[in-house]
Amino acid sequence: MRRGKRPRWMLKIAEERIDILFRMADREFSANPHRSHRYTELARNIAMKYRVRIPREWRRRFCRKCYSFLKPGANCTVRIADGKVNFRCHECGHIMRFPYIREKKDRRRNKIESHTTKEGTDEQITVGAHNKCGESQSDR
């Protein structure tokens, strides 16, 4: 391990704490929005300190300008336009744009994978079936 590099176990703990803080922010938002904003800020600080990426599912849940936790319909507006998902923060008015292409590709890939696995199981069933004489292939 070179000098200044953190051990893997430390990075794993940081990732777990980030996830816990975002889940707590999500739970706490309806009762106490300021506390959820603080949880988001703490999670972001941990990510910066340990140089760990915030998971994609949570990256879109806080404002990049004011760092407040975003709850669609409560303090942010979500719109889809021109192949992008637009999040508008009601706290500061900042608009974040994320490309919609990745979601489309993931959905298309999952559809193709589920279709090929269904066909693959059908082929396996027909291959192991009995032949015309009523004997299985192992009886020959």
From Swiss-Prot:
InterPro entries: RNP4, Rpr2/Snm1/Rpp21. GO terms for biological process: tRNA 5'-leader removal. Zn(2+) binds at C63, C66, C89, C92. Keywords: Cytoplasm, Endonuclease, Hydrolase, Metal-binding, Nuclease, tRNA processing, Zinc. It is found in: Cytoplasm. Binds 1 zinc ion per subunit. The keyword Hydrolase applies. Its cofactor is Zn(2+). The keyword tRNA processing applies. Gene3D superfamilies: 6.20.50.20, Immunoglobulin FC, subunit C. It holds the Pfam family Rpr2. One of its GO terms (molecular function) is ribonuclease P activity. It catalyses: Endonucleolytic cleavage of RNA, removing 5'-extranucleotides from tRNA precursor. GO terms for cellular component: cytoplasm; ribonuclease P complex. Induction: Constitutively expressed (at protein level). Residues 107-140 are annotated as: Disordered. HAMAP family: RNase_P_4. Belongs to the eukaryotic/archaeal RNase P protein component 4 family. Consists of a catalytic RNA component and at least 4-5 protein subunits. Part of ribonuclease P, a protein complex that generates mature tRNA molecules by cleaving their 5'-ends. This is Ribonuclease P protein component 4. The gene is rnp4.
